[in-house]
């Protein structure tokens, strides 16, 4: 189940936790983050490739492409047996910003976005069917867990794709990892 947990940037206390999709979308919208639920136009097999995935979500993908003028769209898939999973996970674990907004749609599996806005950190557990759009220059990080298992559609307005500017902050080390965060809910 998708979930929003809102912590103070000093995570000593208990977070506010929201699991209703509409409430999650409303709360995230209040900080400029788009969050919505999509449904596939057809059933996908577990080994569906990029073309099959994009075809299943064609109407939603086309709507976003028209609205934002994305220059490229691709599908990334990461499984627990991927030989580079630790290196790929490490790439996203430190707080960073982008000069462009970051849009991800979860076709399968789950991942955890951490959005550092003001004196709060919003942990957004995204699962199958969730679309999240993180505004440009929003400090954030992402954790896929030690055994990642997800498939995402990624949208880019620039041809060079994902380019991060790391903030140098160690704030990410003070918050639960993906695996720690989902453990109580599993």
Locate each region found by the language model:
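N-terminal leader/capping segments at the start of a protein or of a new domain
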Residues: 1-70
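Structural signal for conserved beta-strand scaffold positions within catalytic alpha/beta enzyme cores
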Residues: 37, 74-77, 154
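Conserved short histidine dyad/triad with adjacent acidic residue
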Residues: 74-99
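Short, solvent-exposed loop/turn segments at secondary-structure junctions
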Residues: 85, 113-115, 122
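Short, conserved beta-strand element in jelly-roll/cupin
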Residues: 97-117
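Conserved metal-binding segment of the jelly-roll/cupin
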Residues: 126-146
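Double-stranded beta-helix
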Residues: 143-186
